[in-house]
Amino acid sequence: MDALDNILNRNSARILKNPAPSNDEMQIVYQAALRAPDHAWLRPSSFIEVKDEGLQKLSNIFESYALTIPNISNVIQEKYKNAPFRAPMIIILVNTFKEHPKVPAIEQKLSTAAAAQNIMLSLNAMNYSAVWRTGKLAFNPFIAKHLGLLENQEILGYIYICLLYTSDAADEVV
């Protein structure tokens, strides 16, 4: 698949199935991520790979967060608790702000966003699908703290990863 076809044909599948990429495949994906534009070579992007038992740990964190929401319904609480199990692997996108006179915080976030796009395009080229999720679970200080992130670190989203599932449903853009 050439680069332009990869860009034009990538979409987010609604159905996420096993398997996840191998460790060797993920090393290539991370190399591609780090080729994203990075003003002043600050390296603001890092990635937490969640799979296997890690999905349960992330589920526990999401459920703990849900319990802090006043008057949360059981349905929404279960939705948060089950969110990590939608795919066999999740990459948590972390942006680390570093003080720099010429590189404001927004440019550092844009670098991490570009890294995320490189991740998704790399996975697509390897016949995997990726869905970038944000919402209340991203940009969330409670979850960041429970993941052990520092004050200058922020979650920019979660990339859910699975085998590229080919069906009419997979062709729908999410």
Regions found by a protein language model. Give the residues of each.
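Small-aliphatic-rich amphipathic alpha-helix that forms the alpha element of a beta-alpha
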Residues: 33, 91, 97-145
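A glycine-rich helix N-cap at a beta->alpha junction
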Residues: 149-164
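N-terminal amphipathic, basic helical "cap/leader" segment at the start of enzyme domains
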Residues: 1-86
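Short, conserved beta-strand edge motifs with alternating hydrophobic and charged residues
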Residues: 48-50, 91-94
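Single conserved hydrophobic/aromatic residue that forms the stacking wall/gate
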Residues: 165-174
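Structural motif
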Residues: 88-90, 129, 154-156
